[in-house]
Amino acid sequence: MSVTFPVVPRGTVITPHLVRVGGDLVSVLGGPTQRITRIGSRYAADVELPTLDPTCAAEWLACPLTAEGTGDTLILVMPQMLTDPLPPAGLTGTGTAGSNQLTYVGPAPRPKPGMWFSFMVGGRNYLHLVLAVNATTNVLTVSPLLRVSPSATLLDFANPKLEGFCSTDIAWSLEWFRFVGHKFTITENA
């Protein structure tokens, strides 16, 4: 099971960032640093909510507290930076774990660089960002590397889901008994 956050309220600041797996090998003799890219990198997002009315605040606060108590994952629908036009429902993709390329099949309009999408494999959502689109071969270059091998899997551009756990303390602020903010970080777990 998973717990899905409500619609992101206006004024919310979401700061996505890549959690890298691998590392940098720094030469002890002054040579160039080598970047080791490994399968397993994933996204996290810092979420900072604005001042909310009590009902909305209670809904947002209940989600991470419920997930913490049950051990369920949280789902945050990532807002698209580019929304016009979104690729249609029914776009499917196939790729190989460890690759950063995904072949897609479906009608126009095509995905664009900078668009978030997610797909589900084995009951888990995997979030990716489109880096480049080859319209001739219908290949997407994505970040991070694919952690699983999707096969004719539905790509969700309308509601891209970051699924994971809160990786920070669950805390909120009250000022004169008014909910004035809530900050947390959610990190993909699959």
Place the predicted regions along the sequence by residue.
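Extracellular/virion structural assembly segments
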Residues: 1-190
